[in-house]
UniProtKB/Swiss-Prot annotation:
A GO MF label: allantoinase activity
This enzyme's EC code(s): 3.5.2.3
Annotated protein name in UniProt: Dihydroorotase
Catalytic residues of the enzyme: 304
Catalytic activity entry: (S)-dihydroorotate + H2O = N-carbamoyl-L-aspartate + H(+)
InterPro entries found in the cross-reference section: Amidohydro-rel, DHOase, DHOase/Allantoinase_Hydrolase, Dihydroorotase_CS, Metal-dep_hydrolase_composite, Metal_Hydrolase
Keywords associated with the record: Hydrolase, Metal-binding, Pyrimidine biosynthesis, Zinc
Function: Catalyzes the reversible cyclization of carbamoyl aspartate to dihydroorotate.
Pathway assigned to this chain's UniProt record: Pyrimidine metabolism; UMP biosynthesis via de novo pathway; (S)-dihydroorotate from bicarbonate: step 3/3
Binding site residues for Zn(2+) 1: 59, 61, 151, 304
Binding, Zn(2+) 2: 151, 178, 231
One annotated Gene Ontology cellular component of this protein: cytoplasm
Domain of life (superkingdom): Bacteria
Length: 428
């Protein structure tokens, strides 16, 4: 099916929002211009809505295989499509881990059979993510590994991390890191700060993250490896990454929507839906994340979509697993709380969720360019809705944002020229 989207707006090559039509033919973007006419194409009048590149998320947890009670490739990718994401990168903390030919081939077959959006799987750095034996990077790359990470845990052995970076560098691949120094975790379930003290909870200190990043940056410099930092959350981490970039070290970084919108002061009670890793930090950390995003220290926004069951989250804040769902709330949360409040521009938000992650990892995505795959998201910037977890397509309903009123909701997502998801009656 060919589509002609009429009367939309998009961000052009100069970063300006302008009027446009967009023609999709044979799964590709055929033309982006005003007043397009075309035969043999279904005309969809988007009536002034934003035509954006499909959103790109380099940090997601789909749980399959092994955690299908939390999420599946099918439910997770449908939730991603509803959130406007057309390309997502799946973390390897599944059971089994994609750490060898057999497991990666099985995962790729599942993706091919079930995914509603483009899914790029990470390969594990170490076998079973146990930290003691390196995987066969060459084989995992051959089978389509996006990059290498043990996300969910930090690689504790510096010699292992250095060896992994050297091998990844030879393959022109990135090493992606969840940064925690295990000796500093303190059995914590929240940030070590005012909230932990008030509620008598063990806290995770900020330095637990930043000291690990500092170590890895020096290792990346020694290995001449592209090193990407997951979900930055502390002022110290931002400072270390900024210094590394100024020194010319190949480091990039991401931040989550929840760390940009919330800090520990916003946690109303010992509610497990506010439990994520890294935890919500203090006000100074939150301000540093915004500053880091604006000055280029932090390159992109990634959701860290981490679904869990209601039963798992009902165990109380100390026993419940870390993580919140992110796909279906990301854009409206960021648009409402950052763009509408004048903290960043709409153009910047689009870049942080599209071209910046795509360019960082060399993906042919994130831009509406003629000849590229038609991965497109239509967004109604005027539409206001209340976040209602019961409407989530993800199996995970675990969100701290239930009841929040937000503007800027995706209404249609196109992947490879096919409609992957559409809001009922939004475009008629």
């Amino acid at each position: 099916m060919n589509y002609l989207f009429k009367n939309g707006r998009y961000m052009n090559e100069e970063g300006k929002i302008v009027a446009t039509d967009l023609l999709v033919q044979d799964g590709k973007i055929a033309k982006v211009a005003e007043n397009i006419t075309a035969d043999n194409a279904e005309v969809i009048d988007v009536n002034g809505k934003l035509i954006a590149p499909g959103l790109v998320d380099v940090h997601v947890h789909l749980r399959e295989p092994g955690g299908e009670h939390k999420e599946t490739i099918e439910t997770g990718t449908l939730a991603a499509a509803k959130g406007g994401f057309t390309t997502i990168c799946a973390m390897p903390n599944t059971r089994p881990v994609p750490d060898c030919r057999e497991h990666m081939e099985d995962l790729q077959n599942r993706i091919k059979e079930k995914a509603h959006v483009n899914v790029l799987p990470y390969g594990a750095i170490t076998v079973r993510q146990a930290g003691s034996e390196m995987t066969d990077f060459e084989t995992l790359k051959e089978l389509g590994a996006f990059a290498f990470t043990d996300d969910g845990v930090g690689v504790q052995d510096a010699s292992m991390m250095l060896a992994a970076m050297k091998r990844a560098a030879k393959l022109n691949m990135a090493v992606v890191a969840h940064c925690e120094e295990n000796t500093l975790i303190n059995k914590g379930c929240v940030h070590e700060g005012k909230f932990s003290e008030k509620h008598g909870l063990n806290g995770i200190p900020s330095v637990c993250e930043s000291v690990h990043i500092a170590r890895d940056i020096l290792l990346a410099e020694a290995a001449d490896c592209h090193y990407h930092v997951c979900h930055v959350s502390t002022k110290g981490s931002v400072r270390v990454i900024r210094d590394a970039k100024r020194a010319g070290i190949k480091v990039t970084a991401e931040v989550t929507p929840h760390h940009l919108v919330l800090c520990e002061d916003d946690i109303p009670s010992a509610d497990p839906n506010f439990k994520m890793n890294p935890p919500l930090r203090g006000k100074e950390d939150h301000a540093a994340l915004i500053e880091g995003l604006l000055d280029g220290t932090i390159d992109m926004i990634a959701t860290d979509h981490a679904p869990h069951t209601a039963e798992e989250k009902a165990q109380g804040i100390e026993r419940a697993p870390f993580g919140i769902t992110g796909f279906e709330t990301a854009f409206p949360l960021l648009y409402t709380n950052l763009v509408k409040k004048g903290i960043i521009t709409l153009e910047q938000l689009i870049q942080f969720l599209t071209e910046k992650p795509a360019d960082t990892f060399g993906l042919e995505a994130g831009r509406l360019k003629e000849g590229r795959a038609a991965d497109i998201t239509i967004i109604d910037l005027e539409q206001e809705e209340e976040i209602d977890p019961t409407t989530f397509l993800s199996k995970g309903k675990n969100t701290p944002f239930a009841g929040w009123k937000c503007q800027g909701w995706p209404v249609m997502t196109i992947v490879g020229g096919k409609i992957a998801w559409q809001k009922e009656s939004a475009l008629v």
